[in-house]
Amino acid sequence: MKRTLKVSFFILCLLPLFLGSKAEQCGSQAGGAVCPNGLCCSKFGFCGSTDPYCGDGCQSQCKSSPTPTIPTPSTGGGDVGRLVPSSLFDQMLKYRNDGRCAGHGFYTYDAFIAAARSFNGFGTTGDDNTKKKELAAFLAQTSHETTGGWPTAPDGPYAWGYCFVSEQNTQEVYCSPKDWPCAPGKKYYGRGPIQLTHNYNYGLAGQAIKEDLINNPDLLSTNPTVSFKTAIWFWMTPQANKPSSHDVITGRWTPSAADSSAGRVPGYGVITNIINGGIECGHGQDNRVDDRVGFYKRYCQIFGVDPGGNLDCNNQRSFA
């Protein structure tokens, strides 16, 4: 059993935003360009929605202008438990507590429900079919990130989601201290359902859920509610020129002209592009994409909803 992908691959696509290894995106450094999706333009010419971008020196679309709202925990999300009772959760993630899974016993139903109810709109947007599709999509993408399945696994490879808590290579530090610090001796490798990676993602997620994840990154592998919260935060939050996965699956995202020309059309495939498009998308068939689709189809079948079209990103250019 081996987890096939980790979010660190996706983060490679975001490194230009944080490390400055790519040409500036906006402002005087980019010929007066304005950031997409209402993002702030920092004094250094990069797009974002947090204080380093919208605060001192911000060049355009600053705090007085509309910017994307980064979700913070609230008391919303009333009926996720109605749509996903514990019996259904156990059916979907059938082997998560199997002794052959390194993370057995960690991902509890109660932790998922508590985290889900902390974010307004998650699993509660639209009609019941839309809500179920979002929950199926979230559980499918995170199941792929934590999969312990193999082709001949009991009940098939798509019954083995949520098998791992931490990535298998725990030697990498993943510290890029330009915008967020790194605590001495701490590592920011992939942890949790979305395999959150890099200190700046730990910092942003911790800021949103009010936990000090810079100094306590291991909370993602010791506290299942915190772990689920970081995954849902990632799901609900737009990234630079990328929409949130939540907006895509609930039909709230409208592709721009650039998206359309890149083949990025509404559907589950765009979510894979958001998460790991620089690695998996745009070069034809990819086994990792197929695995994500396989989980999604299984979960949609369990929910009794149509998965819809545009499930892969084989012919989509990445957002990067």
Curated annotation (Swiss-Prot):
Its EC number is 3.2.1.14. Residues 1-23 form the signal peptide. The active site is at E145 (proton donor). CDD domains: chitinase_GH19 (cd00325), ChtBD1_GH19_hevein (cd06921). The keyword Signal applies. Disulfide bonds join C26-C41, C35-C47, C40-C54, C58-C62, C101-C163, C175-C182, C281-C313. Induction: By fungal infection. Keywords: Carbohydrate metabolism, Chitin degradation, Chitin-binding, Disulfide bond, Glycosidase, Hydrolase, Plant defense, Polysaccharide degradation, Signal. PROSITE patterns: CHIT_BIND_I_1, CHIT_BIND_I_2, CHITINASE_19_1, CHITINASE_19_2. GO terms for molecular function: chitin binding; endochitinase activity. Residues 24-64 form the Chitin-binding type-1 domain. GO terms for biological process: cell wall macromolecule catabolic process; chitin catabolic process; defense response to fungus; polysaccharide catabolic process. InterPro entries: Chitin-bd_1 (IPR001002), Chitin-binding_1_CS (IPR018371), Endochitinase-like_sf (IPR036861), Glyco_hydro_19 (IPR016283), Glyco_hydro_19_cat (IPR000726), Lysozyme-like_dom_sf (IPR023346). It catalyses: Random endo-hydrolysis of N-acetyl-beta-D-glucosaminide (1->4)-beta-linkages in chitin and chitodextrins. Belongs to the glycosyl hydrolase 19 family. Chitinase class I subfamily. Defense against chitin-containing fungal pathogens. This is Endochitinase. It comes from Pisum sativum (Garden pea).
